[in-house]
Amino acid sequence: GVPILDYESVLEAQVEVGLGPLHTQFGPDGYAYTSLFLDSAVARWSIGAEGYRPQDGWSLISKIPVQYNVGHIATAEGDTVSPDGNFLVSLNKWSVDRFMSTGPLLPQNFQLVDISQQGDNLQVLYDMPFTGGEPHYAQIIRADKLNAWDVYPEVGWNPLTQSVDPNA
């Protein structure tokens, strides 16, 4: 019962961004960002929506090298209808010879990229080793959008069911 759409009939554009494109996130200013596994880079490209695009639509604007072999990337609310923020985090799979040895497994690493400037102005701001296994998927949300509790609403609160639980 699920309709199968013809690929060519629903294709708006196809932007050649580089080798090994994997994941795409969006910024608040009309740019999209795609991780390039084989290029070890993140591509910035302009989307084509008239009145929204910052530069020529559907075109590669720039690439920023990351180390090494990026998989997932995350921008603030970058996979929603209203992306928000000035930063991208590149979740890189390899960090060969970049950080102190932590044992037989090499750490992966995250890189914080400033995406606040227009055009080809991208800058890596920070590198962080990460030893929690290969990084997969992340969400970034502005802190002022969270309504965090300082304490649970009631004694015996189960955070999984969001209710009082006699076994909690």
Residue spans for each PLM region:
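Predominantly soluble domains enriched in secretory-pathway, periplasmic, or organellar proteins
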Residues: 1-168
